[in-house]
Each structure stands twice: as C-alpha cells, then as structure tokens.
C-alpha cells in the first residue's frame, strides 16, 4: 500500500468510528492526521513501516501532544523486520504504535490491547495488588509462587509492586494457578512524555529574532521542527495558543503551509499566524501574514491577538 493510500485508509477508519479528521499532506511531518471525538484529540502519524518514524519526529509529536493535551499515536503495518499484529502494542521513542485493526477495536468495540511487544518477546502488565492478594489468600509464599512460575523471588516482588511487565508465558501461568484474569489493558492514549523538553532553541537568525520578540511581550515559544509551522506560541494567563510559521518571504510553500496551519488551528481550537521578514500585512487562508516590523511595535500578547482577530474579521 502506497504512503498516501495508507494515510487515507486510516482516515476512513477514524471517520467510520465517529471522529472528525484532518489530513495534512506535509512530507517529513511528525503527524499526518488530526482526529477529534468528544473531548478526545489525537495526533496521529500513519505510516506503513513504523521504523521510518524518527526520534526527532517523536520529540516534536510529544511536544505538540503535551501543549494541546492530546494523545499521540503511531499507526502502521510493519517494522523493518516483521509484520505488526492486531491486538499488540508496539513502541517507538516513547510513542505507542498499533495496527489499523487495533485502532478500530479500541474505539469501535471498546477493546483495548493487552499485549506489549518489547525486545525479547511479548509482555503484559498485571494487577500487582490483586496478585499479592491472591497469593496470600491461597497461602503461597513469595518463594513458593516464584518457583511455580519459574521466576526469581525478586521478579515476583516487582510484579506485585507493579514495577515490571510480565512475559506472556508467566501471565498465562498466573491465570492458570489462580483461575482469574490479572492482565491490565494498555492505555494507548497515554504516551510517555511527562519529561519532554519544551525547548525554544531557534534554528535560523530570523527565528531567533521572532522568538526573542515574542518572549519580550510575555509569550512562551516552543520550537517544532517537523510540522507545517515553526513553533507554538503560548500565553498561559489568557489561554492563547498560536501556530506560528516563520519565513523570509512569501512563496508558494508559505501559502501551502498557511493553508495547513489554518486547517489545523480550526480543528484544535487555536489561532495561526505567519511572520515574514519581507511582506505586506494580509490574511491568507484565514491566517494573518505579519511582517517582522509589526512584532517590533506590539506591546503585549493581548495586542498581538487583537491585531490577529481584527485582520481576520476584516478579511471575512
């Protein structure tokens, strides 16, 4: 299946199960689908081979997910070595990856996956507290149960504390011993990005100038490398979020990026703007284009947002 065909296939699945979707055709981007349903917001990278997903893309995807309180997910068909299986969760750089079939089961049938593919085999997470209660109820010591399972006493202690995943074989033995399900579902919507850096390091002289000016008016800037925009600009007190593009001058690529920013801003409930070194003030695809001199004259975040809203209203 070709890259574009696969993205469209995943988008059709999402729409079938009630999601509003946006497909972004931006080569090299950290995501190519945005999906919303009720209060749920997903940033999805759909690609047939999940090993083509880079660490840089993963870091950007985590930043976006953290800023927008969204869930990042990879959807794929294979790795470079093997086909992915339905019902199993894979991981790349801290982001969960599933097949289209697993995605459908999660949201259409309410069946979360239970098995995690890790180096060395398949693993599950078990209810450690329930395991300890059952062990004590049946009168097993740590050593006795560990011997039955074929694991060390220390490993069994980690299982009971919930500090370690369990091989599929051990989990099946546990359920045979106690005749009770102990496996906990994997929450694919909860990626591991608590410690992600919201860095604002600029890559160009123009980016540095724009970032510094935005920071001087009280805004925070988070650099994003693999998206249609260069940064997310925020102001927490007034809950301002701006998808911010930066270019030297207006080109066809700028216009295409502005269109994508406009579409994304609408679906995530934010605003967008482009700052160009050389440009006239205008609105393209509902996204204001501002020359850098405008930023130099702005006194605070509220005034910037006021300019953006006035330009959009004048255009409509």
Curated annotation (Swiss-Prot):
Residues 131-189 form the HTH cro/C1-type domain. NCBIfam families: PRK04140.1 (NF003162). GO terms for molecular function: DNA binding; DNA-binding transcription factor activity. SMART domains: HTH_XRE (SM00530). This is Putative HTH-type transcriptional regulatory protein PYRAB03670. PANTHER family: DNA-BIDING PHAGE PROTEIN (PTHR46558:SF4), TRACRIPTIONAL REGULATORY PROTEIN-RELATED-RELATED (PTHR46558). It comes from Pyrococcus abyssi (strain GE5 / Orsay). Pfam families: HTH_3. Keywords: DNA-binding, Transcription, Transcription regulation. Residues 142-161 bind DNA.
